[in-house]
Amino acid sequence: MRKLNLLFLVLFLLTGLSTLSAHNLEESIASSDRTPAFATRDVYRHPHETLNFFGIEPDMTVVELNPGGGWYTEILANYIHYPGTLIAAQGSYYLEGFKKKMNSSSMYGRVELVNLNSTLAEPNSVDFVVTFRNLHNWLGADMDSIFKNSFKALKPGGSFGVVEHRAKPGTDFETMKSSGYVTEEHAIEVALKQGFELVAKSEINANPKDTKDHPKGVWTLPPRLRLDDVDRVKYEAIGESDRMTLLFRKP
């Protein structure tokens, strides 16, 4: 009887921990700490589905590459708890402003800030690296370098999650640079070259309404709306871009 009670206790604790993890993610997304304008974009960016697909857990050491204004950082900073750590690898342009953002709230207590053009973390020390809508900024040598540093920082078996504006198959390199859309083929090619294995793809962030032939590239669409009021209703109806969602693994 005593053994049976112990078994029930263990099962209860395990179930509770699993529920707590899921609840924490939901709470992190619903948190009042988030910038209201960011939260309104959940309908396009699907943070719950995306982070669940990647499999990020709150006790992991996670590197977010080039978080920019911190759209995902606000969620991850609330979600990741001791002994987990979030490392924000920020581009030089955003570093000073991001320091102020981190000093503005206690939720950034487990966030470390490093330069994107660094080694990111100690070799083989990170559980997960993620990047959201950044590859078009790195096309060329920068992308190779950042993927290489990400691979080195990850533990064997660690994961690399990528979300990026998706170009039509066969789109040439110069068009990718000017339009802000990158082909899946190119993203996968660069990752494999650095030693990653492709684990899975998801259509969580797909948008079949996006024709990808807009006058100002991906920036024609929300949230940028580069044409201002020209065809605004049309582009708002399309919504945010069609995106690939890829999961890689370090062997």
Where are these regions (language model features)?
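Class I SAM-dependent methyltransferase Rossmann-like catalytic core
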Residues: 25-53, 57
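Conserved class I S-adenosyl-L-methionine
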Residues: 59-68
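Helix-to-beta-strand junctions that scaffold the AdoMet/dcAdoMet cofactor pocket
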Residues: 80-81, 138-140, 154-156
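A short acidic, Gly/Pro-enriched loop at the edge of an enzyme's catalytic core
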Residues: 120-129
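A short glycine-rich, Lys/Arg-flanked "PGG" loop and its adjoining helix->strand segment in the class I
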Residues: 144-156
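Conserved beta-strand signature within the Rossmann-like core of class I S-adenosyl-L-methionine
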Residues: 157-165
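Conserved Class I S-adenosyl-L-methionine
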Residues: 173-199
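C-terminal lobe and adjacent flexible extensions of AdoMet/dcAdoMet transferase-like proteins
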Residues: 240-251
